[in-house]
C-alpha cells in the first residue's frame, strides 16, 4: 500500500471503535519522508510523503470502514531526567549537548535513550532521574554544526 499523505491523528478517533493496525517505527524513522515497513498485522506499507513534513506518533496513514493504520514508535529504555531548578536544567542540558546525546524535553522532563555511561554523568550533576520505558512521540530535530 502506497501512502503519500497523513489522513489524520489517532486522537481524533478516540470515540471510534475502529481497530488500529500499528506501524511501529524507530525514533529516527520519524524524520523520514520515504519508508517501507510492515504493520503489526502484516500489511506492507510504502510511505512517500508528498510534502517535506515529518512523521509523528499517532499519525493515521490509512482509514477504512473498520481499520486505521497509524504510526507509533518502539518502546525504548530511557532515562527520565527530572530537573527541579533552572540551574539543574541548565547543567544537565549542557552535559547532554556536550556529548551530542539526542534528547527530547516533554513538560518538565528530559528524555534520553538508555546508555549506561550516562548514569555517572547524571549522578555527577546531581539531578534526579529514573529508568523507564517510553515511546518517543516527536522526531528529533537535528541542528548541524561543526567544531
Swiss-Prot record:
Q: Enumerate the residues binding Ni(2+).
A: 100
Coiled-coil segments on the chain, per record: none
GO CC, any one term: cytoplasm
CDD domains reported for this sequence: UreE (cd00571)
One of its Pfam families is UreE_C
Cofactors that this protein relies on: Zn(2+); Ni(2+)
Keyword set, alphabetical order: Chaperone, Cytoplasm, Metal-binding, Nickel, Nickel insertion, Zinc
Bound how, and how many: what does the cofactor note say? Binds 1 Zn(2+) or 1 Ni(2+) ion per dimer or tetramer.
One function term, GO molecular function aspect: nickel cation binding
One GO process term, biological-process aspect: protein folding
Q: Which Gene3D superfamilies match?
A: Urease metallochaperone UreE, N-terminal domain, UreE, C-terminal domain
Compartments in which it is found:
Cytoplasm
Quaternary structure and partners: Homodimer in diluted solutions, homotetramer in concentrated solutions and when bound to Ni(2+) or Zn(2+). The homodimer is thought to be the active form.
Q: Which family does it belong to?
A: Belongs to the UreE family.
- Tell me, in a sentence or two, what this protein's role is: Involved in urease metallocenter assembly. Binds nickel. Probably functions as a nickel donor during metallocenter assembly.
Q: What is this protein called?
A: Urease accessory protein UreE
What organism does this protein naturally occur in? Sporosarcina pasteurii
State the organism's lineage.
Bacteria, Bacillati, Bacillota, Bacilli, Bacillales
Amino acid at each position: 500500500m502506497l501512502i503519500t499523505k497523513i489522513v489524520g491523528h489517532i486522537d481524533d478517533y478516540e470515540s471510534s471503535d475502529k481497530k488500529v493496525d500499528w506501524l511501529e517505527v524507530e525514533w529516527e524513522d520519524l524524520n523520514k519522508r520515504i519508508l517501507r515497513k510492515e504493520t503489526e498485522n502484516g500489511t506492507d506499507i510504502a510511505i512517500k510523503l508528498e510534502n517535506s513534513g515529518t512523521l509523528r506518533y499517532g499519525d493515521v496513514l490509512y482509514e477504512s470502514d473498520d481499520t486505521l493504520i497509524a504510526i507509533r514508535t518502539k518502546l525504548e529504555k530511557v532515562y527520565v531526567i527530572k530537573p527541579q531548578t533552572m540551574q539543574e536544567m541548565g547543567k544537565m542540558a549542557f552535559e547532554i549537548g556536550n556529548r551530542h546525546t539526542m534528547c527530547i524535553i516533554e513538560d518538565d522532563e528530559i528524555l534520553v535513550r538508555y546508555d549506561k555511561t550516562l548514569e555517572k554523568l547524571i549522578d555527577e550533576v546531581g539531578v534526579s532521574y529514573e529508568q523507564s520505558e517510553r515511546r518517543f512521540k516527536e522526531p528529533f530535530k537535528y541542528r548541524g554544526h561543526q567544531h
